[in-house]
């Protein structure tokens, strides 16, 4: 949402926002005559390769933010997290192999070193050079982390052959408008409220 709005507001590039459902600010951007010519929304399921046929063939940059995220969904649907997140990564790379770009930013997660900090007492804040690991493989929590580790490796090690500059961002519990309560920060707030007798 914020990246789309930021880039459209610059008015020096055209932005294609591709997702399985409409972003909360897309209709407002599309209705604004001063912004709409810089913006193209594409709604489809990008775990299906056929969805990529709706995209233009020339882009300078890709911001790969699409994924199943959130504690609740990861615990409830671990197999779907693996399927969707892995398929999205591979489909983007297959598309880039035929439609070159200059840069790809992959949205990863600090969850990638959560087990390292837990099991090996690593420092917090944690160095990005620390080895990554997961905890107990039977716990669904780690399905999300493993898809993000896979994504990092896939985008980093495909970069030379596909001639793009990769950037990996390991977010730590970001939150913003309209994200709902299925994420870490709302969970912490809810737990605090319950422990202190607040509604």
Segments (PLM) and residue ranges:
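Glycine/proline-rich active-site loop of Rossmann-fold NAD(P)-dependent oxidoreductases
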Residues: 149, 162-167, 174-187, 194-199
């Amino acid at each position: 949402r914020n990246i789309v709005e930021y880039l459209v507001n610059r008015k020096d590039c055209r932005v294609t926002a591709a997702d399985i459902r409409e972003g909360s600010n897309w209709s407002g951007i599309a209705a604004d005559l001063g912004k709409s010519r810089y913006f193209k929304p594409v709604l489809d399921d990008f775990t299906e390769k056929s969805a990529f046929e709706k995209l233009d063939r020339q882009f300078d940059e890709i911001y790969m933010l699409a994924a199943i995220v959130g504690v609740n969904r990861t615990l409830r649907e671990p197999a779907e997290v693996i399927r969707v997140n892995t398929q999205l990564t591979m489909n983007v790379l297959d598309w880039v192999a035929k439609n070159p770009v200059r840069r790809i930013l992959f949205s990863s997660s600090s969850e990638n070193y959560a087990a390292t900090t837990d099991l090996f007492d690593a420092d917090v804040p944690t160095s990005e050079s620390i080895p990554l690991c997961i905890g107990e493989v039977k716990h669904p929590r780690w399905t999300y982390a493993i898809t993000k580790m896979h994504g990092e490796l896939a985008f980093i090690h495909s970069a030379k052959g596909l001639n793009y500059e990769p950037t990996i961002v390991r977010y730590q519990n970001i939150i913003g408008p309209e994200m709902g309560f299925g994420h870490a920060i709302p969970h912490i707030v809810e737990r605090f409220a319950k422990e202190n007798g607040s509604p």
